[in-house]
Regions:
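Active-site bordering "gate/hinge" segments
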Residues: 1-200
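Long, well-ordered mid-to-C-terminal structural blocks that present hydrophobic/aromatic surfaces
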Residues: 194-214
């Protein structure tokens, strides 16, 4: 998949990207009708897009987003979905650089099973985990913060204003209409809310390997 994407970014022109996006629109049209349960599985190379110029593709995506947005809005919170990851050799070598490729792959596989809480009693583990996250979200809602401030000895100094009447949510989501509960990300450790895009000021320093657009 990464290799196909590389060829696309390297060789496909802006006008062709616009044509290809019509296929994505057709797919979204059908998704809004059937609202399928979706499982997204990733196993990509963290450095897969190093040195690749994606400007043509990004420009096409930005231009066509207003067309796509109506479909995203139509489906929002109406269907169940989950994103999870499978190990790849490239990813495994990044995480376990001192091990042989097959051993690194096995270690990453075991780490994913553990962090996604499916190595033992998965249903019990997730019920307990979701309950804990929901309790933390409840506490944050009771505090009703105006802003969040992050400071660290590594140089991070960031202030983020929150939207008025914001609400903290956690791993458990419920579909609109059908009222089906689901967890969208595996793993997930987050509680989250809505910041103000005009109220972010400061600097963030990454202390871990960071993959940004490959």
């Amino acid at each position: 998949c990464d290799n196909i994407s590389k060829l696309t970014f390297k060789n496909v022109k802006y006008e062709t990207h616009l044509e290809n996006i019509k296929m994505d629109e057709y797919k979204l049209q059908n998704m809004t009708k059937i609202l399928p349960v979706s499982i997204y599985v990733e196993d990509s190379d963290p450095d897969g897009f190093n040195g690749i110029d994606m400007s043509e593709s990004i420009r096409a995506q930005v231009e066509t987003y207003p067309i796509m947005k109506k479909y995203f809005d139509e489906m929002e919170n109406k269907y169940q979905w989950v994103i999870c990851a499978m190990p790849s050799m490239e990813w495994a070598k990044k995480v376990f650089p001192n091990d042989k490729p097959k051993e690194a792959f096995k270690k990453l596989e075991e780490a994913i099973l553990k962090t996604t809480r499916i190595d033992k009693d998965a249903i019990k583990n997730w019920k307990e985990h979701v309950k804990e996250l929901q309790e933390k979200a409840k506490i944050l809602n009771e505090y009703n913060f105006d802003y969040l401030e992050y400071k660290s000895s590594n140089g991070t100094d960031l202030k983020i204003k929150l939207m008025p009447n914001h609400s903290w949510l956690s791993a458990r989501e419920t579909t609109l209409g059908s009222n089906v509960e689901f967890t969208a990300n595996m793993p997930t450790e987050e509680v989250f809310t809505m910041p103000s895009y005009e109220g972010v000021d400061g600097l963030v320093v990454s202390t871990k390997p960071l993959s940004f657009r490959g």
